[in-house]
Amino acid sequence: TDLSNNFLGKIMKKIVFFIAFTMMYCGKPAVNKQVVYGLVIHGGAGTITRENMSSEKESAYRGKLTEALAAGFEILEKGGSSMDAVEITIRIMEDSPMFNAGKGAVFTNAGTNELDASIMDGSTLQAGAVAGVKTIKNPISAARKVMEETWHVMLAGDGADYFAKEQGLEIVNNDYFYTERRWKALQKAQDAEKHGTVGCVALDRNGNLAAGTSTGGLTNKRWGRIGDTPIVGAGNYAN
């Protein structure tokens, strides 16, 4: 029917636009042409629509995604680990106000920012996560510290913030995460910008796979709410 065709058309446009904001680099040996290492990232493209995207904004998104992708790929190209590649790639997106992670995180209904992140090493099946953190500049790095420095899988809230400080990670005031765009989104509770997650999957030269995710969650979410992003096996997995 015309209705179903119209609906399918809208879905396909979103899929195409999602692919446009999901970027991948792959490295190939000179002889057999098989991919031996690579990197795939996304910047929360499920919440980015053509209607709300100017050419300038699109260029800015692509530029930052390319920067993140290049940084992670350089690590893999030099023989570095997939875990290092995932962490540095996501840190770059967390440091940008463009994405709903780190600096660009959305606001809770209490007007604060609560961030979640997780990382997993496919070679060992070890994972780490933080949830509901308010003062950790780069939650993805805290998630890795949980994995490597504790016998836990997840730390949440004040306990996670305190742990990150103990580990020497950079701590910021909660207002560091403030951006005018996200504050306005809270006021308007716009569906188009209510959620989003950044993510990265890397395969290194040793054949080890790692994955990481980071998010600010839902705009206007109830404070204390934790979504699927930091849940290993739900929002993130590598094997």
Outline where the language-model segments fall.
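Alpha/propeptide regions of enzymes that mature by internal proteolysis
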Residues: 31-239
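Bacterial Sec-dependent N-terminal signal peptides
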Residues: 1-34
